[in-house]
Structures are given as C-alpha cells and as structure tokens.
Amino acid sequence: MSRRGTVEEKTAKSDPIYRNRLVNMLVNRILKHGKKSLAYQILYRAVKKIQQKTETNPLSVLRQAIRGVTPDIAVKARRVGGSTHQVPIEIGSTQGKALAIRWLLGAARKRPGRNMAFKLSSELVDAAKGSGDAIRKKEETHRMAEANRAFAHFR
C-alpha cells in the first residue's frame, strides 16, 4: 500500500482588480519571461479596448469568448498495431478552458496589428461574436473528432 498522501487540487487564484479566475488564467498564459506585471498591463489594456468597442461589460465578453472557443471533444494520437490513429476523447471543463485560452492567445499573436493588447481585444470580440481564428480552430478540432469517430473504441 502506498504511503503517499493525496495531493490537494490546486485552485486558480483570482486577479487583484476584477477578482476573476479566468482573468488570472489568461494572464498566466500571456506571461513571457516571468514579466507578470507586463502581462497584467496587456490584459487590462485589452479589457479597456473591449469596453470601448462593445460598450458592454468586458468580463462578460471574455466569458462568452472563452465559452465559445472551449472544445467538448479533441483527438489524441494513439498507436494501435503499427499504425497511428487519431482517437476522439472527451475533454473536461478545466482542460477545455485551458485549451480555449491557449487557442485565443495563439490566434491573437498571429493577428496583424499594433500591439498585443489591441490584437487580444480584437480576437476576444471576434470570438464572442462567433468568428475569428480561435473559433475556426475549435471547429477544425470538432471536425477531426467527427471524422475519426470510428476509432472511438480505442480509448
């Protein structure tokens, strides 16, 4: 019998201004080279730009964007009998949110534009409306899972 204790599940802390865990998760993914204050600056500027563009609550736009990009299912490479199959697997809510945030930031970084705050705000507004690269990535993932549904029993 193992003597190790059970590990407490880590909960994401909330950010100082909005007291929101999603904002903190987003800041931690924006973060580069340990410059967290810069990551906070970028996100807060993006939130201000969202407020100016949409004239609605920017946190609801952020939630809507992440909800729209969060995948329900993904594909995982699985080697069976010498060939590799893309096996569709269901994704939990935490992992789905993490993927959504990663896709949103990747799409924002690829966008042409002046600075990261501008690009991030544009991507979040587009995702909330149901367009943009991050939404396309989610749809592509769902299409891949649907196409490989025959391999679902390999889980």
UniProtKB/Swiss-Prot annotation:
Primary location class: plastid
Secretion signal, residue range per the UniProt entry: none
Subcellular location: Plastid, Chloroplast
Gene Ontology MF: a single term: rRNA binding
GO CC, alphabetical: chloroplast; small ribosomal subunit
A family per Pfam: Ribosomal_S7
Statement: the UniProt record of this protein carries the keyword RNA-binding: yes
Biological processes annotated in GO: translation
Annotated keywords: Chloroplast, Plastid, Ribonucleoprotein, Ribosomal protein, RNA-binding, rRNA-binding
Function: One of the primary rRNA binding proteins, it binds directly to 16S rRNA where it nucleates assembly of the head domain of the 30S subunit.
Family in the record: Belongs to the universal ribosomal protein uS7 family.
Assembly mode: Part of the 30S ribosomal subunit.
Name the record gives this protein: Small ribosomal subunit protein uS7c
Biological source species: Beta vulgaris
